[in-house]
């Protein structure tokens, strides 16, 4: 459904438009008679499931793909639609299921309460091992990195440009306060610090179906976002060790990892390429392009960086306020997508000129 300036559709901005935008940017150069380098497009459709199919294909087509000068990924965006945004860093991801079992069948809570510990209370004890409940700070040292001073400087610059819109974009209840005291602290926390989210639960009946029963088990799906530079496999191993050691009350406790992905930190773009993006942005928007970070995870970015260590990386896109990616009213911002198409054309042409 198109209702300007939006194109509505599940998967539209995250990120079904990417292949079309890339193809159109090359077509524009061909129609204008502008030389361009060889462009190879990889369209993979399991990114939301961890990109497990991608490594075998990269390996199988190593000779055909060669060593790219630049890898372009359109799965990002920024805090407004006025600028062209380039993502310099992405957080990684560690997730798994924390299971606590205390009995083989449900027991009357009046008869057992006070003698058998609740599996939910044991979950709370275990969660306190990895997160400070009052602040949300993740307490696993291996999930933290030293935050460079330039990150704080860039966060202040972003604050000055976008102001409170970063917080205001979220559909929170009116009385909710943000975790951080300042906007720049919030920007850094969203991108360069680890966070824990409980994203699912089993063993809990609905409120309507709940009875006076001490339940056998509580299972929680834990999702840790980790900053770039953290080894995700080591981090998930440490999480498992911390959560499973010395189970409270001798309960059966297991943490079963199901996904891990490293974060990403892009190397600087070459001068001519950076200049081409800047010129295109100024021509199209009247504003310079801006670098930002994304607290989310694109698993294949670190994977591609490991495969092509000498390549430049341009991670960009038109995700922004109100697009509601993964939501029922997900939508693509058409004007900024058109501008990005032209900017990408200019970038591709600049690569050809400097080969």
Model-predicted regions and their roles:
Residues 36, 67, 89-95, 191-193, ...:
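Short, solvent-exposed loop/turn segments at the edges of secondary structure
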Residues 85-101, 313-316:
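Flexible glycine/proline-rich, aromatic-decorated loop/lid segments
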Residues 13, 104-106, 224-232:
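A generic structural motif
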Residues 80-81, 138-217, 225-238, 246, ...:
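An extended, acidic, His-containing surface patch that forms the Zn2+-binding/catalytic region
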Residues 97-99, 103-171:
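Polar, glycine-rich mid-to-C-terminal structural blocks
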């Amino acid at each position: 459904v198109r209702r300007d300036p939006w194109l509505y559709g599940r998967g539209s901005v995250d990120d079904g438009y990417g292949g079309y935008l890339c193809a159109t940017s090359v077509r524009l150069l061909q129609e204008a008679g502008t030389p361009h380098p060889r462009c190879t497009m990889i369209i993979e459709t399991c990114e939301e499931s961890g990109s497990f199919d991608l490594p075998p294909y990269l390996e199988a087509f190593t000779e055909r793909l060669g060593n790219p000068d630049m890898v372009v990924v359109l799965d990002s965006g920024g805090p407004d639609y006025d600028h062209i945004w380039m993502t310099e860093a992405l957080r990684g991801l560690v997730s798994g299921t924390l299971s606590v079992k205390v009995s083989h069948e449900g027991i009357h809570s009046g008869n057992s309460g006070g003698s058998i510990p609740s599996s939910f209370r044991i979950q709370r004890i275990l969660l306190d091992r990895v997160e400070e409940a009052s602040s949300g700070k993740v307490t696993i040292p291996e999930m933290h990195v030293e935050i460079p001073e330039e990150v704080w400087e860039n966060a202040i610059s972003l604050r000055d440009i976008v102001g409170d819109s970063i917080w205001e974009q979220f559909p929170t209840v009116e009385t909710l306060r943000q975790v951080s005291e300042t906007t720049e602290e919030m920007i850094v926390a969203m991108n360069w610090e680890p966070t824990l989210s409980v994203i699912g639960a089993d063993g809990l009946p609905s409120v309507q179906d709940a009875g006076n029963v001490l339940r056998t088990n509580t299972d929680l799906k834990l999702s840790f976002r980790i900053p770039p530079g953290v080894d995700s496999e080591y981090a998930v191993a440490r999480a498992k060790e911390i959560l499973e050691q010395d189970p409270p009350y001798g309960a059966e406790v297991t943490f079963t990892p199901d996904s891990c992905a490293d974060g990403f930190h892009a190397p600087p773009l070459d001068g001519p390429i950076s200049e081409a993006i800047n010129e295109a942005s100024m021509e199209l928007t009247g504003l310079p392009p801006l670098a930002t970070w994304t607290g989310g995870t694109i698993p294949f970015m670190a994977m591609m960086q490991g495969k092509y260590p000498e390549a430049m990386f341009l991670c960009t896109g038109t995700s922004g306020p109100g697009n509601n990616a993964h939501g029922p009213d997900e939508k693509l911002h058409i004007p900024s997508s058109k501008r990005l198409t032209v900017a990408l054309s200019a970038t591709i042409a600049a690569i050809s000129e400097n080969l």
